Design a protein with these regions (language model features):
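Immediate post-signal-peptide N-terminus of mature secreted/exported proteins
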Residues: 38-95, 228-275
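Alpha-helical rod/repeat scaffolding segments in eukaryotic adaptors/tethers
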Residues: 53-58, 83-91, 113-117, 142-146, ...
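Long, amphipathic, charge-rich alpha-helical segments that form helical bundles/coiled-coils
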Residues: 70, 116-142, 152-159, 170-196, ...
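C-terminal motif of bacterial Sec signal peptides marking the signal peptidase cleavage site
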Residues: 17-20
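Preference for long, well-ordered alpha-helical segments
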Residues: 180-225, 360-409
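Bacterial N-terminal signal peptides that target proteins for export
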Residues: 1-9
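Alpha-helical segments in soluble extracytoplasmic regions
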Residues: 75-165, 213, 256-347, 390-394
Length: 429
């Protein structure tokens, strides 16, 4: 498995370089940025529709990053539903995973052709079957079945490598592509093993690594579908800035969901999930520090930590069935969102209007409130929908923020890089 700090350090460096290379004077005539999910990704899951074909390297990368990363988390949660023997949640997870696989295959087919998309889908579906078999074997303590599922997953990785080499017309070697997927399958097996052993700290650490690994794999899959000179656009600093923020903000959304749901599972799992929320907050704070300097980064960390606390206070109130505390938490969340929106608007010199960013953060909070309410009521299908819609919406926020940073912000790095504190303050009262 990759070193835990690898992606975070990469993102911090990218944020600093990208802001330096792409900062431009603010223009009074610049249109107000959107805070909705990007058109290439947004609004599809609620209606269970198709995905619009990407026409540019940036659009395709954004799609594949989203779909690979989200698919990873759907698979993780589906495997855990097997381990915990929660059939109602498993039914919802199975359905969402199947549907998302079809949509992912549609994105791949749009990039590489329908025939290659269909071949990819067969490989991916086989992988899902083997992940499920692995989880069932772990749950049943069946060593022979576990080994058979592992062998199947490694064969799936080889099949993916052969497919990718052919689909990319040799731009990617089969062995290199297979190695990427071998890392993926090993991570998902490792998290299942850790979760079954109640080593929740390890399970959630590996889950986060798996999300980041497949987000990056999505970028690579997108690049390989274009000639090298066209694909080079994805190496531009502003594109790396976009990808860095999208990865971290999407990860924030997903880790909050994990932690809110872990509220119902008991303190050990809650603390393990919350630790990864804090690690994500630390990474976001470092990224902000690379762009705006350590003083502003500390302001961000404080505002973001309040945002996190409000969301987790709400889920605690839901778990306790405390209507008064739920109402109080919602009121506090509105104040936290306003403070965070003011900070973000200020650092980009009002290039990002206060109203839209406040509304976007409020929508983010609402997605998380709705999903935990649905989860608590065992409306697992609704909870899944809120999860997917909320993830897409956060990618839209990332694009909006990157656009504003690109137009206005220059990094203010101290000697030795950004010196910020560590993490948010996710905790259960």
């Amino acid at each position: 498995m990759r070193a835990r700090t690898g992606p975070v350090l990469l993102v911090v460096g990218v944020l600093a370089v990208a802001a330096a290379c792409d900062a431009k004077p603010a223009s009074r005539s610049s249109p107000a940025p959107t805070t909705q999910a990007p058109a290439h990704a947004g609004g599809q899951h609620a209606e269970h529709g198709g995905v619009a074909a990407a026409r540019t390297p940036r659009a395709l990368a954004a799609q594949l990053e989203q779909y690979f990363a989200q698919h990873t988390l759907l698979a993780v949660r589906q495997m855990r539903s097997v381990l915990t023997a929660t059939p109602d949640y498993r039914t919802a997870a199975d359905g969402e995973l199947q549907e998302y696989t079809g949509q992912l295959a549609g994105v791949v087919g749009g990039a590489y052709g329908d025939a290659q998309g269909e071949r990819f889908e067969r490989i991916w579906e086989q992988g899902i079957a083997h992940f499920t078999a692995y989880a069932e074997a772990v749950a049943g303590n069946d060593a022979e079945a576990r080994q058979a599922a592992r062998a199947g997953l490694l064969a799936d990785a080889d099949a993916y490598g052969a497919w990718f080499a052919e689909a990319s017309k040799g731009r990617v070697a089969a062995g290199d592509a297979a190695a990427v997927l071998r890392t993926h399958v090993q991570q998902l097996m490792d998290q299942a093993d850790a979760y079954a052993a109640r080593d929740y700290d390890q399970a959630y650490k590996v889950e986060r690594a798996a999300y980041e690994h497949m987000f990056e794999a999505g970028t690579s899959l997108a690049k390989a579908s274009f000639p090298p000179r066209t694909a080079a656009a994805l190496d531009a600093p502003v594109e790396k800035l976009r990808a860095g923020f999208a990865m971290l903000l999407g990860e924030h959304m997903q880790l909050i969901i994990d932690t809110q749901r872990a509220t119902f599972a008991g303190a050990p799992e809650f603390k393990a999930a919350a630790a990864q929320v804090n690690a994500n907050t630390a990474a976001l704070t470092q990224g902000m520090g690379a762009i705006v300097g350590p003083a502003k980064a500390k302001e961000f960390q404080s505002a973001w930590a309040e945002h996190v606390e409000g969301l987790l206070e709400y889920s605690t109130a839901v778990a306790d069935n405390d209507e008064a505390e739920k109402a109080a938490a919602r009121e506090e969340m509105r104040g936290y969102s306003s403070r965070l929106a003011l900070f973000l608007s200020d650092i980009v010199r009002n290039e990002l209007p206060l109203g839209p960013i406040t509304a976007a953060l409020g929508q983010h909070d609402q997605h998380l409130v709705d999903q935990v309410d649905a989860y608590a009521a065992k409306r697992f299908g609704d909870a899944q929908e809120m999860e997917l819609e909320g993830y897409e919406q956060m990618l839209g926020v990332a694009n909006t923020l990157v656009g504003a940073i690109q137009r206005t912000v220059k990094p203010q790095l101290p000697v030795g890089g950004s010196q910020t504190g560590g993490g948010g303050t996710a905790r259960r009262r």
